[in-house]
Structures are given as C-alpha cells and as structure tokens.
Curated annotation (Swiss-Prot):
Pfam families: EFG_C, GTP_EFTU, GTP_EFTU_D2, LepA_C
Subcellular location: Cell membrane
GO cellular component labels: plasma membrane
UniProt protein name: Elongation factor 4
Family listed: Belongs to the TRAFAC class translation factor GTPase superfamily. Classic translation factor GTPase family. LepA subfamily.
PANTHER family: TRANSLATION FACTOR GUF1 HOMOLOG, CHLOROPLASTIC, TRANSLATION FACTOR GUF1-RELATED
Residues the entry annotates as binding GTP: D18, H19, G20, K21, S22, T23, N135, K136, I137, D138
Domain named tr-type G: residues: 6-188
UniProt keyword terms in alphabetical order: Cell membrane, GTP-binding, Hydrolase, Membrane, Nucleotide-binding, Protein biosynthesis
Length: 602
C-alpha cells in the first residue's frame, strides 16, 4: 500500500567514527520492528566483516522503516547509512543528495570532532535539516552541557534543541523518531512528471547483474519498463524493483520521493555510473539531475600479485570492487622487479588499506603493495605539463622546469595539553601554520597547510600517538604548489629496483633513503659475494649499505706451514668473489619488498 508523499521522510545519520552511528541505526531498526529477535545482530547495516571489525561504516546501506507516530499516522522513514571517515566523504555526499534531513550524532564525552565539522558542512551545502543528537549519555564521562555549548559555538545549531540519547541502552530513540517526523520536510518532486531517479550506490549480484540503489526525484518506476541512463545513453529493461527492510523485498512500483533498488540485467560496471540519472526511455526527462562531483583519487600505489599467474584474477576482483566503489580507479602497469600488476588510485590511505584487505579476504589474493604516492605535476623545459602517478614516469632532471605537489588545508581538533607536540609534528612535515582557535576552554582547532605527500604515510598514526588518541583530523585539497622534489632510486648490486623508487622533498631524501637501505640490508640474505645497496638521486649516491659475503673457511685444511701458502688461498678466494660479483644475480625475497613498502613504518 503506497504511502502519501507527505508521510515519507528521507534522512541519514552523520557522525565521526565511534560516536555510535551504527548502534543508533540498529536501535531505530529494532524500535520500528524492522528487526526481530533472531535476525538482530550488532551493527546490522555494516554488512562487511571488515566494517564490523574496524568499527567503521564503509559502504552505503539504505533501509525503509515503518513508524506509527504519536499523532496516530503511519510514516515511511528511509534511513540512508553513511560512512564517517575522512576518506569516504564522497560516499557521504552521495547519501546526502538523496535525503532531506540528517541526524547529527555527537559523543557526549568526546564532543565535536574534525570529521563531524566536515560532514555538517557537507549537509548544510545540500540544504538538509539537521537534528542534533548527543549520544552515549550513559557514560560516566558524559558532559552533555559542554557538548550543547560546542554545538552552538562551533556549528551554530541550537544546543537546547539537541536530543539526549544512549543508543546502547535505547534511551531517546522514540524522541528521535518523533523529531524526524516533525522536523524533516517530506520529499518534493512530481509523480506525474517524466521519471528522474538518482543512482546513489550500486552493488554487483552474480545472478541479477548490477543492482542500483535509487532515490526517485520525479515520476514513477515500474518493473518491465525500459529505462535510460542519461550520462551513458544506455537503455535497459527493469527486471526487478524493491526496497530494503533491511532484507530486500520486491515491490510493484516506486514513486517520487521513495528510495529503493532496481535490477535491470546491467552486466557492465561502466554502464551505471553512480551519480547518473535514470529516466524512462519512452518519455525521457529533458535534463538530468545535477550530478555529483566525480571522486578524485588522491593517493596512488601499485598492486601486484605475488604469483604472476593471478594477474587476471586481480583484474576481475578490481572490476567487481569498482562496481561497489565508485571512487576506485585502476590501470595495468608493469614493473621489472614485480612483473604485471595495476596502478590504483584511492581517496586516501584507509581507503587503500580496505581495498587491499578486501582483495585478499574476499578474493583470496596474495598482493604486494608499492609505496603510496600522490599525483605530482611536472612542467618540462619545452612547456609540456605531465601528471606523474608513478616515480618511473618522471623525466630526467635536466628536462624539468618545475615540479608541483598537492597541498591540503589540514584541520586538527585536539585537547590544549597537546598543542606543542602536534605543532612540532606539523612543522616537521613541512606544514605552514595558518590559524588556531579555542572551541571550548580545553579544546583547540589548529589549521595547517601541508603537502598531501607528508600526510599519506603515517601522519595520522603519529598524530594519534602524540595526543594519546585524542586528536581528530580532516583535510581539504587546496591545489598544487611548487616544491623542491627529487626522485630517489634504490640500486641493489648496481641494478635499479623500480618498485622501490620514491619521489620525495630534497630535504627529506637522505633520511628516507637511509631507512630504506638499512631495512634492505637487514632483509636480503647474504650471498657468496658482497652486495652493495645504494640510494641515488640521478648519478649521485646519497646512502649506501653493504651486505658482507659469506666466506668458506679455505684455510681449514691448511695446518701450519708458510704464511704465503695461506695468503695464496685467500687471494684465490678473493679473485673468485670478484668474478662472482660481476656475474652474480641477487634474488630479493618477498619479505624485503613487503617490509620496505609497508605503509606507515618510516
């Protein structure tokens, strides 16, 4: 039985990691009867094992809830779950475009974090009605009054209006549902107009093909009808329509304002772009919905199968993952040291780790990941501008007019006791101080301009250890700026290992090189000849380590006798070692690559 449009509410939940967003979603599902006893498990909307383990939400989930309000009327609430991590702000923006309201969940003991600010600003950009919720009030360390003041001072929301809740105990859930019904506006749109539906996510089903998640803005959608993707122009026939409750349930119709899913026998990932508009092929809309900005990868790295024969399996796995993850980009590449693999682009470091872990878990692949790098911009002496995603693409130093790297505006929220160590860390990472403001008597918001390359390694880990885990960060891209950058090559026994080349600021080149050559020295097994490991910028060697040769005890049988006899045997051994060094080939073990390329261990 279709519900009138004025009784539909589309909303999402935005929060920083660990502020209780997924637990609150569980309580809303439980309270409205969407989940009963046996099917209830913690973090229902976090369907990936990885999401539950790391306690974060990566993929979007959309659920329809039926709720009878205090006014006695039945309402249809569509909850769109969103990720909270800085890397997934693109997915957050997708879910926001499908909503009219947002629940802003803030931890009563931790207060507003940097990511909360970023997501609230995104929600305000989409003109959403924001309902503030102060969660975890059952904790002994909860300070709801302080958080209310922060909501007013930092975001400009009415703190007295905030709902006090404990998602763990289920306190305040009814009040939240009533506020959604009262404050979130019903969806607009005209059911009689030509169909326009926004694709805000998709997943791949081996039997039904691509299943797209839709929010209908105008018109109506029926099974069996032909639809057209407005960006690609491809046409398909709808085979199935449905909604998530959270289990999928088929329906005979979706109307303007509703959220649901569609299967239409779409076999190719590229045919249904997230952010595209679906329209009726017989009566198409005149213009598509304003599209999303396309997610721009910020961090690149190489993914290579340990076993070269698995290259096609990796390609197939990436194809499937990219279907569920619109922000993953990849292209084939070859490496003399690692063979065939892919150069992949990610939103950030967590995104990269999660993709790698999903490839290994869900597809059973063994992978080597090269050091992450950002996209550098090189202007050649002839005026040509190149985007460098891989150190091996960098032209010779003599042909480079200037090099630029991406800079970001980093916002750091931390307790005032840790200002010193954090500023020292930022200074060490070539940060330029911009601003510092107190958002409460104990908490400070510091902003720095920093090169993205300095953040993608282990900045977040260092920040957490410098502040005992109390700091949170967020960053926004500022654009490209000129920097003194060099390419450092690693040579083992005179052979360049392209997989270990890095682009780094001239001032940090020696420090980084020293760590890499020392680590290789410890990991490459000794041979019968001496192995020299070098780090070089062009022709100039800046760091060097040697692995001493294994020596056979040639003097063992030479008891007593003349010293010249012993010397002769040693000279003969030395000659053999020299000859071996010229023709010998060093096999570098997998662990050596893995260790040098391991992220965040500088």
């Amino acid at each position: 039985m279709p519900v009138e449009r004025d009784r539909i509410r589309n909303f999402c939940i935005i929060a920083h990691i660990d502020h209780g967003k997924s637990t609150l979603a569980d309580r809303l599902l439980e309270y409205t009867g969407a989940l009963v006893g046996r099917r209830m498990q913690e973090q229902v909307l976090d369907q990936m094992d990885l999401e539950r383990e790391r306690g974060i939400t990566i993929k979007l989930q959309a659920v329809r809830l039926a709720y009878r309000a205090r006014d006695g009327r039945d309402y249809q609430l569509n909850l769109i779950d969103t990720p909270g991590h800085v890397d997934f702000s693109y997915e957050v923006s997708r879910s926001l475009a499908a909503c009219e309201g947002a629940l802003l969940v803030v931890d009563a003991s931790q207060g507003i974090e940097a990511q909360t600010l970023a997501n609230v600003n995104l929600a305000l950009d989409h003109n959403l009605t924001i309902i503030p919720i102060i969660n975890k009030i059952d904790l002994a360390s909860a300070e709801p009054d302080r958080v209310r003041r922060e909501l007013e001072d930092v975001i400009g929301l009415d703190g007295a209006d905030a709902v006090l809740a404990s998602a763990k105990r289920g306190d305040g859930v009814e009040e939240i549902l009533e506020r959604i019904v009262r404050d979130v506006p019903p969806p607009g749109g005209d059911p009689g107009a030509p169909l326009r539906a926004l694709i805000f996510d998709s997943h791949y089903d081996p039997y039904r093909g691509v299943v797209t998640y839709l929010r209908l803005m105008d018109g109506r959608l029926f099974p069996g009808g032909p639809v057209r993707m407005m960006a690609t122009g491809r046409e398909f026939e709808v085979s199935e329509l449905g909604v998530f409750t959270p289990a999928p349930v088929t329906v005979n119709e979706l109307r303007a304002g509703e959220v649901g899913f569609m299967a239409a026998g779409i076999k190719n990932v590229k045919d249904c772009r997230v952010g595209d508009t679906v329209t009726d092929a017989r009566r198409p809309a005149s213009s598509p919905l304003p599209g999303y900005r396309k997610a721009k990868p910020m961090v690149y790295c190489g993914l290579f199968p340990v076993d070269g024969a698995e290259f096609e399996k990796v390609r197939d796995a990436l194809d499937r993952l990219s279907l569920n993850d619109a922000s993953l980009v990849y292209e084939p590449e070859t490496s003399t040291a690692l063979g065939f693999g892919f150069r992949c682009g990610f939103l950030g470091l967590l995104h990269m780790e999660i993709i790698q872990e999903r490839l290994e878990r869900e597809y059973g692949l063994d992978l080597i990941t090269t050091a992450p790098s950002v996209v550098y911009r090189v202007t050649r002496t002839n005026g040509a501008v190149l985007d460098i995603r891989n150190p091996s693409e960098m032209p010779p130093a003599g042909e480079i007019e200037k090099m630029e790297e991406p800079f970001v505006l980093t916002s750091l929220l931390l307790p005032q006791d840790y200002i010193g160590p954090v500023m020292e860390l930022c200074q060490d990472r070539r940060g330029v101080f911009r601003n510092m403001e107190y958002i409460s008597t104990h908490r400070v918001l510091i902003t720095y301009e920093m090169p993205l390359a300095e953040i993608i390694y282990d900045f977040f880990d260092r920040l957490k250890s410098a502040t005992r885990g109390y700091a949170s960060m967020d960053y926004d891209l500022l654009g490209y700026r000129e920097s003194k950058l060099v390419r450092v090559d690693i040579l083992v026994a005179g052979e360049r290992l392209d997989a270990l080349s890095i682009i780094v600021h001239r001032d940090r080149a020696y420090h980084r090189s020293k760590i890499i050559v020392e680590r290789l020295r410890d990991l490459i097994p000794r041979q019968l000849f001496e192995i020299v490991i070098q780090a070089a910028i062009g022709q100039r060697v800046i760091a060097r380590e040697s692995i001493r040769a294994l020596r056979k005890a040639v003097l063992e049988k030479c008891y007593g006798g003349d010293v010249t006899r012993k010397r002769k045997l040693l000279e003969k051994q030395k000659e053999g070692k020299k000859r071996m060094k010229q023709v010998g080939h060093v096999q570098i073990p997998q662990e050596a690559f893995m260790s040098v390329l391991s992220i965040g261990q500088k």
